[in-house]
Amino acid sequence: MRGKFIVIEGIDGCGKTTQIDEISKWIPTSGLLRGKQKLVKTREPGGSLLGKKIRNLILDNHKDNKPSSLAELLLYSADRAEHISKTISPALENQDWVLSDRFCDSTLAYQGYGRNINLEIIKNIESIVCQGESPDLTIFLEISAEESVLRREKFIPDRMESEGIKFLEKVNEGFKLIAKEKNWTTISALQDINTITNEIKETLLKKFSRVNND
């Protein structure tokens, strides 16, 4: 038996990090874990030691030396390959649960729909990179590009967050298409934090309580 792999997706400013922090505190006391199972909280990019260095390369503003779209794609892919090998797969094989802030579909949304890189190229790369790993559940926190910009206007943006609203709109439309195609659980991120947290808890209990009791 392997552990469960849960991913939370969405555009910048949707509240993923806040919700992952809340849910990661709740899961160990929820009754979902069995025996010696633990929860591993992680993120992309930067979910491994090497990944943290790659994250800095990807998200640094670089001023006049920004990476090309293809280089950016391959950096994200390198981060994910290491993340899976060093963090995700070992945890799942140990029967632990993994809760990740982003996974492979963020690349499809940002580099595919956002950067206009051929989707089939990305899917082919991801088929190698993901090493057979796929989430048991993906939750999409949905907000508009306009709301994302409003929420982040007080913060210093990283390179991806500096791309502007037109880029973000394309990414968001990509996420919506992927969510529909893959039957994700979509939750409105316009609600207050506690309401969103409770909806995520209900989703997890509904999906995994029965599995654990079988």
UniProtKB/Swiss-Prot annotation:
ATP binds at G10, I11, D12, G13, C14, G15, K16, T17. Keywords: ATP-binding, Kinase, Nucleotide biosynthesis, Nucleotide-binding, Transferase. GO terms for molecular function: ATP binding; dTMP kinase activity. It comes from the Bacteria. It is an enzyme of class 2 (transferase). Gene3D superfamilies: P-loop containing nucleotide triphosphate hydrolases. Its EC number is 2.7.4.9. GO terms for biological process: dTDP biosynthetic process; dTTP biosynthetic process; dUDP biosynthetic process. InterPro entries: P-loop_NTPase, Thymidylate_kin-like_dom, Thymidylate_kin_CS, Thymidylate_kinase. It catalyses: dTMP + ATP = dTDP + ADP. GO terms for cellular component: cytosol. HAMAP family: Thymidylate_kinase. Phosphorylation of dTMP to form dTDP in both de novo and salvage pathways of dTTP synthesis. Belongs to the thymidylate kinase family. This is Thymidylate kinase. The gene is tmk.
